[in-house]
Amino acid sequence: ASDGIMVARGDLGVEIPVEEVIFAQKMMIEKCNRARKVVITATQMLDSMIKNPRPTRAEAGDVANAIMDGTDAVMLSGESAKGKYPIEAVTIMAQICARTDDVVKPELGSRLDSPRLRITEAVCKGAVDTAEKLNAPLIIVATEAGKSARSVRKYFPTARILAVTTNTKTAAQLCLSKGVTPVVVDSIESTDAFYLRGKELALETGLGAKGDIVVMVSGALVASGTTNTASVHVL
C-alpha cells in the first residue's frame, strides 16, 4: 500500500474525460482522508501565473476548493519551475491556503468513519470533539509511526496539531499532513513525562500560550501502537 497519493489533474485529464476530473479528485481526496493517507493536489493550480503576476479568480477558487475537499497539500509545478513570477505564485497560494483554512469546519459526522471505528480513531475523534467544545487551540499527540497524529488530522480539527515523536522519519513524513507540526524528542519515557514535555514544547513552538487549554493524546506510549488516552490540560 502507498503512504499517500498525488492527484495530478493534468495526467488525469489525459486519461479520463475532462468533465470527470473534478469528481475523480474529490473521490480520491475523500478516500485518502478516510484511510488516513497523505494526499497532495497538483497541476495547473495557478497556471496563468506562469506569465501573469496575478491568478485568475477561477484558479484561486480551484486552490480553495481542493483545501475544502480535504487535501493535505497543494503543489505548484510550472508556475514556480519556469514561470516569470515564482515568488508571487508561492505567496498567493499560501495566502489562499491560510484564508481557506479559517473556514474549514471539523468533520465530526460519520462521513469519514469506518463501519466500526478502530480504538485509535475513536479516541482521536473524541479528542477533536473535546477540543472544539472547549475552544482549545492545540492538540498535542505522542506518536511513533504517525498513525495517531493522522487520526486526529482526519477529523479536520480547528486546533493545530503538535506531534511529538522520537522518530525522525515520522517527523519528516508528518510535515506533509495538514495542520500538523512535528517535533522530535530524544525519548518519551512515560505518560507523565509526555504531559510535561508536550506542554513545554507547546510554549516553545509558540503554538500555545500560558493559560491555554490543550488536549493531549497518548499514542506512542502503548506497546501495540494503539492510541487509548485523551486528556485535557492547561498550559
UniProtKB/Swiss-Prot annotation:
Membrane-crossing residue ranges in chain numbering: none
EC assignment: 2.7.1.40
Pathway terms, separated by semicolons: Carbohydrate degradation; glycolysis; pyruvate from D-glyceraldehyde 3-phosphate: step 5/5
Cofactor(s) the protein requires to work: Mg(2+); K(+)
Catalytic activity of the protein: pyruvate + ATP = phosphoenolpyruvate + ADP + H(+)
Keywords assigned by UniProt, alphabetized: ATP-binding, Glycolysis, Kinase, Magnesium, Metal-binding, Nucleotide-binding, Potassium, Pyruvate, Transferase
One MF annotation (Gene Ontology) recorded for this entry: pyruvate kinase activity
Residues where Mg(2+) binds: 11
InterPro entries the record matches: Pyr_Knase, Pyrv/PenolPyrv_kinase-like_dom, Pyrv_kinase-like_dom_sf, Pyrv_Knase_brl, Pyrv_Knase_C, Pyrv_Knase_C_sf
Chain sites annotated for binding substrate: 10-11, 43
Summary of subunit composition and partner proteins: Homotetramer.
Family to which the UniProt record says this protein belongs: Belongs to the pyruvate kinase family.
Protein name per UniProt: Pyruvate kinase I
